[in-house]
C-alpha cells in the first residue's frame, strides 16, 4: 500500500538536528496537523534544494509521506518551498521568534492540531520580521510576546479563567489584587507575591481573550497597559510557562538574560 501523502501543507520549522551525515530531523509546526517531525534526506548536502529553504521563522509549504524511515512519528519530507511574504527577523526579534519556537516545542504534543494557534503564530512572525530592534519599533516586542504567551497557554488548556478565583470560582473584585500562581491558578495576592494585577486588569485581559479577534484585542490591552502592569504580567506568565515547560530554564530565555548583562 502506498504511503499516505500530505501535500502543500503550510508549515514552519521550529528546530532541526542531525539524523545522519547528510540528513536532518525537522520539528515543524503545521497548520492542519500540529507539531510534526520530518526527516529531510540529503538536506545537509551542498547541492540539496532543501538547504536554503529549511530555516526557522520562514513560511513554508511542505509535502511529506506518513511514517517515513520506518518510524511512526517521523515522516519523510518530499518537498519544501518558501511561501514568501517576509524576510528573516533579526536581532532581538530573531531571539524572540526562537523563544516562541522553543515554547511550542516544549508545550505542544506531537500531531495535535491547533490551527488557530498556527494562524496567530504566523501573524506574530510577520510582525517580528518588520521590527527594527534598534529603532522606534523595538518596544513592540514585549506586548507581542505576552499576547502570544497568553494565547498559547489558553489554546492548550493551561491558562485558568481570568475572571474568577481558580479554587473557589468567586468573581474577581475590580479593585482587589490577584496573583497568577502556577500551583494554584488565580488567587488573592499576598505580601510574598512577586507580582500581581488588579481584578479589573485581569478582567480586561479575559475580555480581550474572548473577543473574536483575540490576538489583536489582547495585544491592544497589553500595549496600552502601564509599564508596571506589563512587567507584573510578564513575571507571572514566565513563572507559569517555566512551571509547565519544566527544567532546565528555556535556552532562548537564558540567552536573552545573558545578553542583557553584557
Swiss-Prot record:
**What's the protein name?**
DNA repair protein RecO
Pfam families (UniProt xref)? RecO_C, RecO_N
Listed A to Z, the keywords are:
DNA damage, DNA recombination, DNA repair
> Gene Ontology cellular component?
bacterial nucleoid
Family stated for the protein in its record: Belongs to the RecO family.
What Gene3D superfamilies would the database entry show? Nucleic acid-binding proteins, Recombination protein O, C-terminal domain
Organism equals Acidovorax sp. (strain JS42)
User: Which gene is the coding source of this polypeptide chain?
Assistant: recO
Q: Report whether Nucleotide-binding shows up as a keyword of the record.
A: no
* The keyword Ligase is annotated on this UniProt entry: no
InterPro entries given in the database record: ARFGAP/RecO (IPR037278), DNA_rep/recomb_RecO_N (IPR022572), NA-bd_OB-fold (IPR012340), RecO (IPR003717), RecO_C (IPR042242)
GO biological process, any? DNA recombination
Function field: Involved in DNA repair and RecF pathway recombination.
Amino acid at each position: 500500500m502506498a504511503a499516505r501523502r500530505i501535500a502543500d501543507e503550510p508549515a514552519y520549522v521550529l528546530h532541526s538536528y542531525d539524523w545522519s551525515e547528510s540528513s536532518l530531523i525537522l520539528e515543524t509546526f503545521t497548520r492542519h496537523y500540529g507539531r510534526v517531525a520530518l526527516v529531510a534526506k540529503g538536506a545537509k548536502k551542498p547541492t540539496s534544494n532543501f538547504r536554503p529553504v529549511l530555516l526557522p521563522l520562514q513560511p513554508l509549504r511542505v509535502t511529506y509521506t506518513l511514517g517515513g524511515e520506518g518510524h511512526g512519528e517521523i515522516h519523510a519530507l518530499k518537498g519544501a518551498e518558501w511561501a514568501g511574504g517576509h524576510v528573516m527577523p533579526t536581532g532581538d526579534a530573531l531571539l524572540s521568534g526562537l523563544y516562541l519556537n522553543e515554547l511550542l516545542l516544549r508545550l505542544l504534543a506531537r500531531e495535535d492540531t491547533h490551527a488557530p494557534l498556527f494562524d496567530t503564530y504566523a501573524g506574530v512572525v510577520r510582525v517580528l520580521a518588520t521590527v527594527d530592534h534598534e529603532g522606534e519599533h523595538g518596544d513592540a516586542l514585549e506586548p507581542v510576546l505576552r499576547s502570544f504567551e497568553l494565547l498559547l497557554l489558553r489554546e492548550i488548556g493551561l491558562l485558568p479563567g481570568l475572571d474568577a478565583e481558580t479554587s473557589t470560582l468567586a468573581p474577581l473584585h475590580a479593585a482587589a489584587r490577584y496573583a497568577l500562581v502556577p500551583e494554584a491558578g488565580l488567587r488573592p495576592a499576598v505580601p510574598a507575591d512577586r507580582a500581581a494585577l488588579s481584578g479589573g486588569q485581569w478582567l480586561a485581559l479575559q475580555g480581550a481573550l474572548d473577543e473574536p479577534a483575540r490576538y489583536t484585542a489582547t495585544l491592544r490591552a497589553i500595549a496600552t497597559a502601564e509599564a508596571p502592569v506589563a512587567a507584573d504580567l510578564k513575571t507571572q506568565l514566565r513563572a507559569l510557562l517555566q512551571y509547565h515547560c519544566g527544567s532546565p530554564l528555556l535556552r532562548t530565555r537564558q540567552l536573552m538574560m545573558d545578553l542583557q548583562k553584557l
